């Protein structure tokens, strides 16, 4: 039973980490708490579902469609909200409040158009084969989620650490003004970050919709709460932190259910979050005076 | 609100104070708002039954006149509409309201005015304890869940179960309370009780724990939104145990959301579209002809309620005095027995908050069904 719960913790943690990745990127670079990330996540799931239902494509092209749509949404988000607010030097809270508005609008629009009920992917599009090792059941989808979370994060870490774009991103995170003086295309990089973060959110939306096999307008809301917790545990804006924080929260929840009781799940998980903040106010990886992209 | 009432009168061709030889029946249901998916089905059930009664000679030659009002699924509006129907339209009896919540608020108005109020969809505890003018033919979960468990236990031989329920929703929690009581009464052991919250998407940790306690079945109090993924994830974890569900799981949506993982789910219901009783077949065919879609439980219960009230009205000798007629109807109603779309039915007197006899609940056998290859199969 413990072995099965460890697998459960890994796949749930992978889901949280994937969601938190895009969220933390926007915070690290744009310095915005993007509360529309849950809505983007939901749009990704609807886009992939629509691609499968209407155009009868298989899963991989559907994920590509979702990436395209959410990338577009990220572009609009930056052009419509982040860029004008940056230009007018709006206070920190303004973009956050604006993203709440975007989130509510988008969710209502989707609800109005597709209805509020649960939708699901047709059965034949899902990889349903399971791997049985001793008494442990592993779904191939779980394996893919875990591997994809690790790959995406590894890729992002490499880009940020070792590429010139990464260097520019780090400079940008430190000081947009200084970066601009050094010849970094600040507006373009901000836009690119918003697009990439939205694509990450959209793809994780598809994966989670597949994992739970349900798509509904408010699916982003609970994820957003967990995502904020993950990002805070890991350290705001830190990519490694999103990974560790995601698995930390996943395991905390699973082990609480296994050994304490499901009634206490959120109390224990968020109690731990609180204790981490008390001991390390900047999160596991955050370093208060410095910022990392 | 007056405008909307007028609109309904226009739409349904019902005008107040016309010919004297008409029996006025007030209908207050949620026709707009969140509860309208129930209220609209209920209205269709009433209209179908009233139409049939009219075309077979009415009530001893008198016509039925339906005065339909929208109570919007809101307590305040239900009270307003009740007052209008009782004092202005001077109806003989009232059907409605749609939600138990509204019934708690509005039924005392009818009780005080001494007018029969007949609910077809109120399942909460305590509605009929309001007073002796309160009737309902909606069967409560407190009656259905023990029957479901009993049949499931007989057929599958289960002796210990694990319980899984949503702990942040009033409906799934009250359904859990009823399950808990039924499990105690039937002396079925509980290996573990687990919970989840609205909006949860991953239930594998709870299911893994349940699997480790080796139950014979899983009792599940959930709405379909969470219940269907729970069934899918259980099957993915290799858990092939039967599920025993509350009313929240009694929906054809299960077959869409948990397709091919939906087998072996036991649910109880006061009505089933599959029921082969001749009265039900006739109802389903007539409803389909009128509306081009299959009826649901709410339409069936409303349809039966109109016939139950008609049985009582046939016994009345109408006087010129409305108060006397209203009282006579109340006295005639408890004795009515009826076999309709939902099967054999009679009333049972409930006790009030003061311990004295009060209103009347439904006595009806629950239909227990199990899912098999994406449909419900009735179990005897």
Regions found by a protein language model. Name each.
Chain A
Residues 1-12, 159-164, 193-231, 256-264:
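Inter-helical junctions in multi-pass inner-membrane proteins, predominant
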Residues 1-5, 47, 51-54, 208-210, ...:
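Interhelical loop and adjacent transmembrane-helix boundary motif
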Residues 14, 25-45, 59, 89-93, ...:
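Short, non-helical or kinked segments that cap or interrupt transmembrane helices
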Residues 56-102, 109, 244-249, 253, ...:
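Alpha-helical transmembrane segments within multi-pass membrane transporters and channels
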């Amino acid at each position: 039973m413990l072995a099965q719960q460890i697998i459960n913790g890994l796949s749930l943690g992978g889901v949280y980490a994937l969601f938190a990745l895009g969220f933390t990127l926007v915070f690290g670079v744009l310095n915005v708490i993007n509360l529309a990330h849950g809505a983007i996540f939901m749009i990704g799931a609807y886009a992939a579902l629509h691609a499968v239902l209407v155009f009868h494509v298989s899963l991989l092209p559907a994920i590509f469609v979702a990436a395209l749509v959410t990338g577009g949404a990220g572009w609009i988000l930056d052009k419509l909200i982040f860029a004008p607010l940056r230009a007018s030097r709006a206070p920190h809270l303004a973009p956050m409040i604006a993203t709440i508005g975007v989130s509510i609008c988008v969710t209502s629009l989707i609800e109005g158009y597709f209805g509020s009920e649960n939708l699901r992917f047709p059965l034949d599009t899902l990889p349903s084969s399971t791997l049985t090792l001793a008494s442990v059941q592993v779904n191939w989808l779980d394996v893919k989620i875990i591997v994809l979370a690790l790959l995406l994060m590894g890729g992002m870490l490499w880009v940020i650490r070792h590429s010139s774009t990464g260097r520019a991103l780090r400079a940008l995170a430190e000081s947009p003004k200084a970066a601009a003086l050094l010849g970094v295309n600040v507006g373009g990089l901000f836009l690119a970050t918003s697009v990439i973060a939205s694509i990450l959110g959209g793809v994780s939306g598809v994966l989670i919709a597949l994992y739970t096999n349900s798509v509904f307008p408010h699916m982003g809301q609970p994820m957003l709460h967990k995502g904020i917790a993950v990002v805070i545990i890991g350290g705001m804006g830190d990519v490694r932190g999103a990974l560790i924080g995601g698995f930390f929260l996943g395991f905390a929840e699973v082990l609480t259910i296994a050994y304490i009781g499901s009634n206490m799940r959120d109390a224990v998980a968020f109690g731990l979050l609180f204790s981490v903040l008390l001991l390390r106010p900047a999160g596991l990886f955050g370093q208060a005076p410095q910022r990392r992209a | 609100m007056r405008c909307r009432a007028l609109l309904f009168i226009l739409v349904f061709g019902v005008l107040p104070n016309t010919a004297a030889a008409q029996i006025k029946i007030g209908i207050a249901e949620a026709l707009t708002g969140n509860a309208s998916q129930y209220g609209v089905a209920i209205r269709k059930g009433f209209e179908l039954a009233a139409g049939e009664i009219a075309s077979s000679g009415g009530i001893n030659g008198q016509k039925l006149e339906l005065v339909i009002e929208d109570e919007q699924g809101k307590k305040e509006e239900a009270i307003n509409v009740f007052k209008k129907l009782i004092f202005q339209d001077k109806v003989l009896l009232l059907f409605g309201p749609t939600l138990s919540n509204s019934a708690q608020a509005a039924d005392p108005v009818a009780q005080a005015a001494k007018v029969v109020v007949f609910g077809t969809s109120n399942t909460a505890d305590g509605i009929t304890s309001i007073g002796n003018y309160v009737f309902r033919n909606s069967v409560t979960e407190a009656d259905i869940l023990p029957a479901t468990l009993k049949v499931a236990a007989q057929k599958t031989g289960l002796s210990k179960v694990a319980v899984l329920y949503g702990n942040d929703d009033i409906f799934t929690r009250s359904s859990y309370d009823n399950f808990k009581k039924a499990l105690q009464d039937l002396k079925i052991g509980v290996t573990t009780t687990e919970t989840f919250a609205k909006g949860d998407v991953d239930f594998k940790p709870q299911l893994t724990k349940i699997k480790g306690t080796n139950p014979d079945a899983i009792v599940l109090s959930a709405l379909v939104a969470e219940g269907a993924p729970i069934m899918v994830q259980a099957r993915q974890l290799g858990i092939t145990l039967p599920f025993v569900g509350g009313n929240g799981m009694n929906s054809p949506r299960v077959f869409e959301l948990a397709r091919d993982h939906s087998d072996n789910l036991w649910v109880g219901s006061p009505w089933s579209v599959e029921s082969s009783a001749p009265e039900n077949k006739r109802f389903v065919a007539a409803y389909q002809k009128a509306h081009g879609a299959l009826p649901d439980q709410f339409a069936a219960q409303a349809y039966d309620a109109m016939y139950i009230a008609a049985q009582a009205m046939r016994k009345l000798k109408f006087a010129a005095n409305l108060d006397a007629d209203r009282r006579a109807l109340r006295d005639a109603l408890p004795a009515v027995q009826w076999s309709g779309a939902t099967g054999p039915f009679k009333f049972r007197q409930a006790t009030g908050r003061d311990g004295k006899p009060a209103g009347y609940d439904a006595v009806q056998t629950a239909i227990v069904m199990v899912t098999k290859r994406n449909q419900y199969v009735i179990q005897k």
